[in-house]
Structure formats: structure tokens, C-alpha cells
UniProtKB/Swiss-Prot annotation:
Source organism (scientific name): Medicago truncatula (Barrel medic)
Secreted among keywords: yes
Family: Belongs to the CLV3/ESR signal peptide family.
Further remarks about this protein from its record: Roots of plants overexpressing CLE53 exhibit normal growth, but reduced levels of colonization by arbuscular mycorrhizal (AM) fungi. Roots of plants silencing CLE53 exhibit normal growth, but reduced levels of colonization by arbuscular mycorrhizal (AM) fungi.
Protein name: CLAVATA3/ESR (CLE)-related protein 53
Lineage, highest ranks first: Eukaryota, Viridiplantae, Streptophyta, Embryophyta, Tracheophyta
Domain of life according to the entry: Eukaryota
Signal peptide range in chain numbering: 1-26
A GO biological-process term: cell differentiation
Positions of post-translational Hydroxyproline modification: P74, P77
GO cellular component: extracellular region
Disulfide-bonded cysteines: none
Sites where a glycan is attached: P77
UniProt KW keywords: Developmental protein, Differentiation, Glycoprotein, Hydroxylation, Secreted, Signal
Length: 82
């Protein structure tokens, strides 16, 4: 009887352990070892740096012009034109 109980407990332990390992691999491994995610994060970071540089250049040009916009919008439609 003791041998049957021990083997049954061992079998249940192995099943539970297997389920835990499969569950943890499904969640943790893609996050830890995904090179695609790292590449996407590096591209996003590079894009943010480029946008910051562009914005700083635009702000510098605008400050040099005294805060005036570079282009002037037209006054509107011509009254003589239909």
C-alpha cells in the first residue's frame, strides 16, 4: 500500500512540475530571449532620438527668428475672383 501511495504521489508531483515548467516557459522565455523585441525597442529608441534632434533644431531656428514662424499664410481668397 505504501509503495502504491508513494508512486501515486510521485506521479502527481511530476505532472504538476511539468505543468508549471510549461506554463513558465510560455510566459518568461519570449520576454527574456526575444531578439525581435530588442530590435524593435532599439529602433523605437533611435526614432525618439532622431525626433528630439529634429525638434531641437526647429526650436533653435524659431528662437533665432524671434519666435516668428518661417512661413506666412495667405490673407485668404481674392475678393475679385469668383
Amino acid at each position: 500500500m505504501a509503495t502504491s501511495t508513494n508512486s501515486r504521489e510521485f506521479l502527481i508531483f511530476i505532472c504538476v512540475l511539468t505543468l508549471l515548467v510549461v506554463r513558465s516557459e510560455a510566459r518568461l522565455v519570449p520576454m527574456l530571449f526575444s531578439t525581435k523585441e530588442k530590435v524593435m525597442n532599439s529602433k523605437f529608441g533611435l526614432r525618439e532620438v532622431i525626433n528630439d534632434v529634429r525638434n531641437s533644431e526647429w526650436l533653435r531656428k524659431r528662437a533665432l527668428l524671434g519666435g516668428k514662424p518661417e512661413r506666412v499664410s495667405p490673407g485668404g481668397p481674392d475678393a475679385q475672383h469668383h
